[in-house]
């Protein structure tokens, strides 16, 4: 402090010293017990919460009663709030290298088809769910923006006709597409997570924290698109494969989660 008063120390150094003193005092005064983990889920429908609760939080998360009955998606096309569209039996399921990234056209076309079905169902039941599409790769983001351009315009028109979308930034543009970074701190009623990968090592997407954030953006409906069998057993250079836990949970909880064979949805698939 004397060095700062004499102009010999920068404010940043003083701030660091001050912070260090606070931390040291915390330890010295034994107030670690005041630190606690946030254990209540105020965002997601309980089935969605349980998907990442078991693998990533050791089952400690609890869904608040404050959102009970307020997170149903009320759509007829899905019978759960957790849905995996499994591409394992698709002949065109493999991802491709583009520059330093990856793309998966099969997944993109399936998402396009899913969005058309969502729009039809939302129109039928007068629902206005906000939608976000998350994918690990920027290259896939660009492909999705291209393939989904038509349906995005249709969603935008639908929202404008059926709600005051100018007052809701999540509806204004139809839906959002991006990597998890663009969804940090936000959520959507419906999240579609595009796994992209269907071959090779999955090091880039095997980040547990980023996967956790991606899945936990959904409030009412979480749709995962990807090759379940591959992702369950995929190899990583270091650490564990987090998809193993997710796939295991979904497969063991079919009463709570819905698995749809993407191969059965080939007929009538929209090409964008």
Question: What are these language model-derived features?
Answer:
Residues 1-272:
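Conserved helicase motor core of SF1/SF2 NTP-dependent helicases
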